[in-house]
Amino acid sequence: MLKMESTQQMVSSIINTSFEAAVVAATSTLELMGIQYDYNEVFTRVKSKFDYVMDDSGVKNNLLGKAITIAQALNGKFGSAIRNRNWMTDSKTVAKLDEDVSKLRMTLSSKGIDQKMRVLNACFSVKRIPGKSSSIIKCTRLMKDKIEGGEVEVDDSYVDEKMEIDTIDWKSRYDQLEKRFEALKQRVNEKYNTWVQKAKKVNENMYSLQNVISQQQNQISDLQQYCNKLEADLQGKFSSLVSSVEWYLRSMELPDDVKNDIEQQLNSIDAINPINAIDDIESLIRNLIQDYDRTFLMLKGLLKQCNYEYAYE
């Protein structure tokens, strides 16, 4: 004979396997989403939620009860199976309906709608009376069946107990929210003041940089004016130099072709650009030195032909 504990152990094994599958599904989903996680924390959270949903929804007890019914049927005790004939049709329909009911129960439990709330909503409904603030509480067919089946008890002590909504201290909650709001407001003001100080500092640095740039521009302008004046003075000096040399050249007893050659070189001096003028003067001086050297060589050769000697004093 099949022991009753064996079927219950099989159901417990299936439930545990479902929990492990839920943990694997949760961790693999987090990995696919690129979210870092602590396996122990995920395991603990999933286990807590899984145990609560399975217990509160009644799915665990329902499965264990069916395991007991199957074990009794296999052992020749058909009483439980006969009692459940009202909802039995065939195995496929029962499995599908059972799956849907379990899914709905677990969904409601995961949304915070616990077993107490589901039972009360299934047993009672409220009918509003038009024109009145009061209402009529109606019992459903399920409540009637429970009363007839002796599943309803009267708890006189429950009347004296305060409802959860009456124990809520709204003033303390308001004070907490007000403190949180004030703290948030203070943090926002601190960040705003910090931003204002940074903005002021940036403006001060910008104004300081503008002053430095303005001073540098003034210095550059003064230097440009000095350079322009210096260039004008050099142009005047070069023009005066050319005129003075030309006047001095005309007073010399040199041949006209020599004077003309020197005047052409003087007139070729660029009096506008000082750099070019210096190059032209350098070229003129080189030519004069070269002419002087040639003249000296000619004079030296002439003295030698005349059997004269020369000496520098």
UniProtKB/Swiss-Prot annotation:
One of its GO terms (cellular component) is host cell cytoplasm. The keyword RNA-binding applies. Signal peptide: none annotated. Residues 1-149 are annotated as: RNA-binding. Residues 150-206 are annotated as: Dimerization. Residues 208-313 are annotated as: Interaction with host EIF4G1. GO terms for biological process: regulation of translation. CDD domains: NSP3_rotavirus. Residues 170-234 are annotated as: Interaction with host ZC3H7B. Keywords: Coiled coil, Host cytoplasm, Host-virus interaction, RNA-binding, Translation regulation. The keyword Cell wall biogenesis/degradation does not apply. Residues 166-237 form a coiled coil. Homodimer. Interacts (via the coiled-coil region) with host ZC3H7B (via LD motif). Interacts with host EIF4G1. Plays an important role in stimulating the translation of viral mRNAs. These mRNAs are capped but not polyadenylated, instead terminating in a conserved sequence 'GACC' at the 3' that is recognized by NSP3, which competes with host PABPC1 for EIF4G1 binding. The interaction between NSP3 and host EIF4G1 stabilizes the EIF4E-EIF4G1 interaction, thereby facilitating the initiation of capped mRNA translation. This is Non-structural protein 3.
